[in-house]
């Protein structure tokens, strides 16, 4: 058996909610600080590594998702993975005219360091960096994510800060898996 490693902790995530507006609308957020370094290091992607049945029962390996459409070998797009509102379930509703999804994906996981057993100053810095990672993933989704058909970006995805009650649209607290 391998000895325990107290430094080996899971990533944590600031989730965010988006509303899918009509194609052609533009709601892209400004490029956040350190965007390029986080985009390349994460990397921001629709490709995820699976661990034999943890997600939908597939085998260990890599799965290439699409944003909105179902890709071969997947159960749906990233958008439907944590969709909160499917507007087709509310015909005629003025409150739920558009789909709303909460984004919790490897692209917005912060895995650079832990906030467990850190000083308050170190925790605050790591939490701020984690927010930048999530805002960077949102910016990537709106500007660079591959679209089925060969184009890039989904600028019609509108942040919904009102749903979490925060000015930046991120959850008030990170999702911590430990």
Regions found by a protein language model. Give the residues of each.
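Flavin (FAD/FMN)-binding glycine-rich loop and adjacent Rossmann-like elements that form
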Residues: 1-178
């Amino acid at each position: 058996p391998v000895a325990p490693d107290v430094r080996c902790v899971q990533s944590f995530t600031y989730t965010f909610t988006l509303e899918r507006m009509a194609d052609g609308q533009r709601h892209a957020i400004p490029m956040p600080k350190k965007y390029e370094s986080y985009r390349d290091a994460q990397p921001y992607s629709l490709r995820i590594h699976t661990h034999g049945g943890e997600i939908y029962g597939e085998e260990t390996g890599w799965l290439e998702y699409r944003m909105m459409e179902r890709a071969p070998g997947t159960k749906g797009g990233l958008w439907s993975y944590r969709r909160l509102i499917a507007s087709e379930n509310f015909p005629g509703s003025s409150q739920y005219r558009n789909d709303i999804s909460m984004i919790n994906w490897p692209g917005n996981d912060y895995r650079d360091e832990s906030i467990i057993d850190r000083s308050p100053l170190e925790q605050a810095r790591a939490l701020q960096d984690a927010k930048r990672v999530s805002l960077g993933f949102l910016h990537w989704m709106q500007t660079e994510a591959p679209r089925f058909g060969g184009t890039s970006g989904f600028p019609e995805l509108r942040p919904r800060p009102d749903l979490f009650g925060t000015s930046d649209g991120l959850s008030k607290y990170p999702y911590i898996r430990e």
